[in-house]
Amino acid sequence: MGDEKSLAHTRWNCKYHIVFAPKYRRQAFYGEKRRAVGSILRKLCEWKNVRILEAECCADHIHMLLEIPPKMSVSSFMGYLKGKSSLMLYEQFGDLKFKYRNREFWCRGYYVDTVGKNTAKIQDYIKHQLEEDKMGEQLSIPYPGSPFTGRK
């Protein structure tokens, strides 16, 4: 039971596996942008007292294992996280406004799952997610020619 936290009259252990992606599932996170989105998300979680247990920024989506206090709903936190990070990314990278209109950097939805006793398994899954994505890309068979004309 060592995972429990406490508020004034509450003992809690609320962990969530959250996955969200940029609009149009574009592969946007490489190099400097990958580091920037990581530091922005860390900063925003810190401001709301949300603890990041594990996180991975893949090329076209982000996995996070978070401890969100029960006084805050997951949907309100995700609205805050995606909204503020979008503004901060647009401020830092001016070229994003040409790819994404109306300052909407993230997809509208997200995936969330509660984490029970299998925290270690989900942490391991998130830790190795980037490697699995790369393996999936390598499994695709390159076609030497044009798929439409059949010529090389």
UniProtKB/Swiss-Prot annotation:
GO terms (BP aspect):
DNA transposition
List residues binding Mg(2+).
Answer: 61, 63, 129
User: Any keyword rRNA processing?
Assistant: no
Per its UniProt record, the required cofactor names are:
Mg(2+)
Q: Does the keyword Hydrolase apply?
A: yes
Please list the GO terms describing molecular function: DNA binding; endonuclease activity; metal ion binding; transposase activity
Q: Which InterPro entries match?
A: Transposase_17 (IPR002686), Transposase_17_sf (IPR036515)
UniProt keyword terms in alphabetical order: DNA recombination, DNA-binding, Endonuclease, Hydrolase, Magnesium, Metal-binding, Nuclease, Transposable element, Transposition
Active-site residue list: 125 (nucleophile)
Q: Which Gene3D superfamilies match?
A: Transposase IS200-like (3.30.70.1290)
- What does the annotation say about its assembly with partners? Homodimer.
Q: What family is reported? A: Belongs to the transposase 17 family.
What else the UniProt entry mentions is: Belongs to the IS200/IS605 insertion sequence (IS) element family.
Q: What does this protein do?
A: Transposase responsible for transposition of the IS200 insertion sequence (IS) element. Transposition occurs in 2 main steps, excision from the donor DNA 'top strand' into a single strand circle and its subsequent reinsertion into the DNA target. This increases the copy number of the IS.
Q: What name does the UniProt record give this protein? A: Transposase for insertion sequence element IS200
Please tell me the species this chain comes from: Salmonella typhimurium (strain LT2 / SGSC1412 / ATCC 700720)
- Gene it is expressed from: tnpA1
